[in-house]
Amino acid sequence: LMIRRPPRSTLFPYTTLFRSPGFDDDAFAVLSQKKNRILLERQPGDLPKSTVRSALNGYLVQARDNGMEAAGAWTCTTATARPESAEDLLFALKLVKHTKSNTVVFAKNSQLLASGTGQTSRVDALKQAVEKAKNFGFDLNGSSMASDAFFPFPDCVELAADAGVVAVIQPGGSINDEKSIDACDARGLAMYTTGVRHFRH
């Protein structure tokens, strides 16, 4: 998508590079105010169809995870639906797909607020993300959260609700899905499932 509306420069204090198919005049004027910031115009290209990883004395060639589930394919599993959060949920889902597992991502107003990455448990990834948001002074109230794989226990959504998250997206598929759904219902969160995990190691 071309960047058309001029974002407030204060929203991106640490962003040094923006890549977009285009920038309108207002967006360019705002984004170019920061010294040494790079604005790169580039049309999207085709992604590789496979990935290659070294494995001991050989290589592992596997299909690349190029898919992304559209909002119309999601299932709302809770009593509360938040269609107004769909844009942030999709944005968070795209980010979490490219982050090392176990991982969760918080997003609001199409901005990454924090991510917890590469943890041995999902709840540790969530705690890491909450702590990062606090350290940067980012308010998680009204934010959306994406997880690269299912929640094994309801503690993740409970902690997310305590942090201010209002909507969650995850693949689903845990034997404890109902417990996480019940925890969301008890706290007024919306939960969407995609049926597809984006596990990355």
Task: Spell out what each predicted region is.
Residues M2-P6, L11-L17:
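Short, small-residue-biased leader/transition segments that mark boundaries at the very start
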Residues L1-M2, A114:
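Residue-level detector of alpha-helix boundaries and kinks
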Residues F18-H201:
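ATP-dependent carboxylate/acyl-activation modules
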